[in-house]
Amino acid sequence: MPSLLTHSILSVAFAVGLAAPVAAEKLKVVTTFTVLADMARNVAGDAAEVVSVTKPGAEIHGYQPTPRDIVRASDADLILWNGMNLELWFEQFLGNLRDLPSATLTDGIEPISIVEGSYQGLPNPHAWMGLDNALIYIGNIADAMAAHDPDNAVTYRENAEAYKTQMRETIEPLRAALSELPEDKRWLVTCEGAFSYLAKDLGLKELYLWPMNADQVGTPQQVRKVIDGVRDNDIKAVFCESTVSDAPAKQVARETGAAYGGVLYVDSLSTADGPVPTYLELLTVTSETIVNALTKDE
């Protein structure tokens, strides 16, 4: 027969169990690609869970979502996407989900227009590559999270301000290094025209093989145009981004005598053990690669 002490212990345990607070579920956020996911994690801190639809290294423009992507996203409280025609697959993807709230992170950004190809006249979607724009992204992320999780609104806004400070401290030394380069050397030659915002921020003129990865890429006409541009302007280095073939850029380098300056990162982060596992490292590695190639032998 149970003792009085046993009854007392069980009664206390039951009462404590009833009184114990139930941990609130964290806000679940899904982003369309890894760059946005890293930004969102910096804003979220420990207050929200953030995942990306695409994996590190993925080409974002023509991505084809899988049924698994849809299942994972269906559990989200909030979806963050870029807009500006970057995720051409997103509207159909969102249509496969229940009525999920989403936020377009380029809201409030002044776009740079694409000037050639099938997407001529449309906004260049790679707005996160500009410093001032990146600050707008961070603010939009904090606003969206705060709206859907007001209990943690202060946390999101404080984290966002701290992250903005880190970003300014990252980019300013790189901008200063490029400011020493003579005007006629300030060219950025790439495969995709994905660096218009960064080029504007760093005071560089831009030349590229194709305007968007979703367009035709690496055609003989595109290669010839850039070869002529490199020769006419005595450009010293050409680059290519990580998610496409560098063969056309290396052909330009061979035929002009320009150096192949290396890989630039824009559409995707790397895995944790790679060169750009975070957005700040993406900015740093990409900008340093440009600076090092253009200032070599100066």
PLM region spans:
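Bacterial N-terminal signal peptides
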Residues: 3-17
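N-terminal signal peptide c-region/cleavage motif recognized by signal peptidases
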Residues: 19-21
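Extracytoplasmic metal-acquisition and chelation regions
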Residues: 24-298
